[in-house]
Regions:
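Hydrophobic anchor at the beta1->P-loop junction of P-loop NTPases
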Residues: 47-49
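Conserved lysine of the Walker
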Residues: 57
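Phosphate-binding P-loop
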Residues: 37-44
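Conserved nucleotide-sensing/catalytic segment adjacent to the nucleotide-binding pocket
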Residues: 74, 86-131
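Short beta-strand-centered segment that lines the nucleotide-binding/catalytic pocket of NTP-utilizing
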Residues: 70-85
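N-terminal pre-P-loop "Q-motif" helix
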Residues: 24-35
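Short phosphate-coordinating micro-motif centered on Lys-Gly-acidic
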Residues: 2-15, 19-21, 109-111, 117-179
C-alpha cells in the first residue's frame, strides 16, 4: 500500500492539468511522504530546488535519497558542490543520483572544471540541484522546479512546477493532485 501524504493542497494550476501545484507541509513526516511521491513522479532527470537558507531543501533531498533506497548518511554539498550517490536497485544495477548545492559557486564555469555537465549524459541519473539560479545560464533546463518557503518552524509551502521538458517527458504531478 502506498503512503498518502497528509499535506494540504494550497492550489493547483487547473483541475485538469498536472503541471503545477502548491502544497502545505505541516510536519517532517509530510516532507518524507512528499519525497516518497517524488520517486514515482520523477525517476530521472534534473530538479532545481530553491528556497531560503534553512527552508528544507537538503532535508527533502535526504528523504528523497532514502526513498530511492540510499542507506547511508546524506551530507549537504554546500562545500563540496556535489555529492554523488550510487543507489543499489532491487532489479540489479545501481541508480546514479547527484545532489548539488551551488550556493557558494563563484562562477558557473567552475562547473565545467569538475565535469558537472557529464552528469546529464546519463539518461537514468537523477540530478537534484539546490541554488541552481547561481548557474541557470550554464545548466540545461530542469524537468521539475521545486520552491520551498518556510512559513514557520513547522510549516513549509512547497510549489512544484513541471517545465516544458518535464511535461514533454511525460511527467505528471497528478499523483499529488489526487491526494
Amino acid at each position: 500500500m502506498t503512503n498518502v501524504p497528509n499535506f494540504s493542497k494550497v492550489e493547483a494550476s487547473d483541475s485538469t492539468k498536472s503541471d503545477a501545484i502548491q502544497l502545505l507541509l505541516s510536519t517532517e513526516a509530510d516532507t518524507q511522504l512528499l519525497a516518497q511521491q517524488l520517486v514515482t513522479i520523477i525517476p530521472s532527470g534534473s530538479v532545481w530546488l530553491s528556497g531560503d537558507l534553512g527552508a528544507g531543501k537538503t532535508t527533502l533531498t535526504r528523504y528523497w535519497l532514502q526513498a530511492l533506497g540510499h542507506q547511508g548518511s546524506v551530507k549537504s554539498p554546500t562545500y563540496t558542490l556535489v555529492e554523488p550517490y550510487q543507489i543499489a536497485q532491487v532489479a540489479g544495477g545501481s541508480k546514479s543520483v547527484y545532489h548539488a548545492d551551488l550556493y557558494r559557486l563563484q562562477d558557473p564555469e567552475e562547473l565545467s572544471f569538475i565535469g558537472f555537465d557529464e552528469y546529464f549524459n546519463d539518461p537514468n541519473a537523477l540530478i537534484i540541484i539546490e541554488w541552481a539560479s547561481q548557474a541557470d545560464e550554464y545548466l540545461p533546463a530542469p524537468h521539475l522546479f521545486i520552491d520551498i518557503t518556510q512559513l514557520s518552524n513547522h510549516q513549509r509551502q512547497v510549489h512544484l512546477q513541471l517545465s516544458k521538458i518535464g511535461i514533454h517527458a511525460g511527467l505528471s504531478l497528478a499523483t499529488l493532485m489526487s491526494n
